[in-house]
UniProtKB/Swiss-Prot annotation:
The lineage of its organism: Bacteria, Pseudomonadati, Pseudomonadota, Gammaproteobacteria, Lysobacterales. This is Succinate--CoA ligase [ADP-forming] subunit beta. Substrate binds at residues 264, 321-323. The gene is sucC. GO terms for molecular function: ATP binding; magnesium ion binding; succinate-CoA ligase (ADP-forming) activity; succinate-CoA ligase (GDP-forming) activity. Keywords: ATP-binding, Ligase, Magnesium, Metal-binding, Nucleotide-binding, Tricarboxylic acid cycle.
């Protein structure tokens, strides 16, 4: 789950990490009220969407007067914005964050994440903040520093001070940096987060460090014990079909292609998409119907796939281990009848009760195309889509 900047800053502040004073507003007049409550300007007005790159898209404005604040908020609120991170999708701006604006002396980068390669919680820091860290890694990798945290020892103050001096901080600032690292480690673990990225972590004209922007990503598997985070979810920032799928407990991700996929098992689903690509097709989605799939679940999966008008064909690829192929076949037949599927459907079944499942499909009298294996199925669905065009 992703979070808005104002939510990320709220969590950072709760854990003693300094952030500029600020508050969200839903109308231009509210934005002016917030600005006045923060004292004399200048202020920053920032569009709240689940994406980075807002500045380049016009979603971050420096304001010297309350008239500027009102104008900036009016221009953003009620509109939609796309950035280089949204893949062409426009996200609604329902809130703006109004904060104090100090003069930036230096921008740093700091993040904490789980490094699956080293199997540790890892910090990444750089003296080059305010830009994409991928760009820094490509152009000046020597400016990036990493720390793999020992689970027994945890992060200590000396780790942070050492990092701070590597980034060119003075003694006072290195001490602040160490405190931020220790508090960030506590936040990361206690909230079951997968990523926290502070970019930039800035030195302002008062000589102190502040988190000017924060990107959070939580571990959805821990949602049952993170009620505060779950309450922060903003479904207006998410793909509608993905929201519906999550409510049905179906793993679904929208993609840009035209061939819908229904598969049981995440690994098989990814392999299916790869084979479709290798055969010249483009997957329209990732959909793992799950090992405990039943007839109704298959029907709901078809509805999710066909909710996109981009879908011109469907490949059902099922390996029946826990799930029975005959039950999947019953679900496919029921779905085709109930949903009124008008695009080619290719089905590959293998595993438990496979012959019974295939017989049900044959006896249905429906124009369902059988496939012998994953490659055969991918070829057939790509060909069927081309022939139907």
């Amino acid at each position: 789950m992703n979070f808005h900047e104002y939510q990320s800053k709220q969590l950072l502040a709760e854990y003693g990490i300094p952030v500029p004073a600020g508050k969200v507003a839903a109308t231009p007049d509210e934005a002016v009220e917030v600005a006045n409550s923060l004292g004399n300007g200048p202020w920053m007005v920032k569009a709240q969407i689940h994406a980075g790159g807002r500045g380049k898209a016009g979603g971050v404005k420096f304001c010297k007067t309350t008239d500027d604040v009102k104008a900036a908020a009016a221009k953003m609120l009620g509109t939609k914005m796309s950035t280089y991170q949204t893949a062409g999708v426009e996200l609604p701006i329902n809130l703006v964050l109004v904060t104090t604006a100090g003069e930036i002396v230096k921008e740093l980068y700091l993040s904490i994440l789980v490094d699956r390669g080293t199997k540790t919680i890892t910090y990444i820091a750089s003296s080059e903040g305010g830009v994409e860290i991928e760009q820094v890694a490509a152009e000046t990798p020597e400016l990036i520093h990493a720390l793999n945290v020992d689970f027994v020892e945890g992060v200590q103050g000396y780790h942070g001070r050492d990092f701070g001096f590597k980034l060119g901080l003075n003694a006072k600032q290195a001490g602040q940096f160490a405190s931020i690292m220790v508090n960030l480690y506590r936040l990361f673990n206690e909230k079951d987060l997968a990523l926290v990225e502070i970019n930039p972590l800035a030195i302002l004209d008062d000589g102190n460090l502040y988190a000017l922007d924060g990107k959070f990503d939580s571990d959805d598997n821990a949602a049952f014990r993170q009620k505060q985070l779950v309450a922060m979810r903003d479904k207006t920032q998410e793909d509608e079909t993905e929201v519906t799928a999550s409510e049905l407990d179906i793993n679904y991700v929208t993609m840009d292609g035209n061939i819908g996929c229904m598969v049981n098992g995440a690994g098989l689903a990814m392999a299916t998409m790869d084979v479709i690509k290798l055969n010249g097709g483009e997957p329209a989605n990732f959909l793992d119907v799950g090992g405990g799939a039943n007839k109704q679940r298959v029907i709901e999966a078809f509805k999710l796939i066909l909710s996109s008008d981009k879908v011109e064909g469907i490949f059902v690829n099922i390996f029946g281990g826990i799930v029975r192929c005959d039950m999947i076949a019953e679900g496919i037949i029921a779905a085709v009848k109930e949903v009124g599927v008008k695009v080619p459907v290719v089905v590959r079944l293998e595993g438990t009760n496979v012959e019974e499942g295939k017989q049900l499909l044959r006896d249905s009298g429906m124009a369902i195309i059988p496939a012998d294996n994953i490659n055969d199925g991918a070829k057939k669905v790509v060909e069927a889509v081309k022939n139907a065009a």
